[in-house]
């Protein structure tokens, strides 16, 4: 349940403090795209209750779960499904963008987490999302790109 209004040329999304859990299964077009599965997982940590996400397209697409749990999420993997218990109070820590989609997941989780998050292997994110730092800072995110010593 997220309040939204769809107009001819825009969508207005209103903030809420309560998000309902959902069940999602990735499918080929026109189903739910597997490429959105990992970013959605970060958002499911905000939902009150248990969300279930089933990956039917690719094996081994849950590398992001290790790092979300490290941030304080409560996610269990069972073969091709994950069970996301929420809401979680995510905390900043060091995580890894294991690929482009996991990187998007880590960015979304970091935006909600308390404290500072360091995302390693950021080249996956920068390669896949044009001007992502500028776009996110323009809406209030604090992001710093630095070289590791």
Model-derived features: positions:
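Short, structured segments at the rim of ligand-binding sites
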Residues: 1-149
């Amino acid at each position: 349940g997220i309040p939204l209004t769809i107009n001819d040329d825009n969508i207005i999304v209103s903030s809420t403090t309560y998000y309902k859990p959902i069940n999602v299964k990735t499918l080929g077009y026109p189903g739910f795209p597997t490429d959105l599965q990992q970013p959605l997982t970060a958002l499911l940590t905000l939902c009150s209750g248990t969300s279930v996400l089933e990956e039917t397209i690719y094996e081994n697409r849950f590398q992001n779960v290790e790092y979300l749990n490290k941030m304080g999420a409560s996610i269990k993997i069972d073969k091709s499904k994950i069970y996301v218990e929420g809401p979680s109070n995510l905390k900043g820590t060091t995580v890894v963008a294991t690929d482009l989609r996991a990187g998007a997941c880590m960015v979304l989780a970091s935006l909600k987490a308390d404290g500072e998050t360091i995302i390693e292997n950021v080249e996956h994110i920068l390669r896949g999302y044009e001007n992502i730092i500028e776009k996110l800072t323009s809406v209030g995110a604090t992001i710093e790109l630095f070289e590791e010593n």
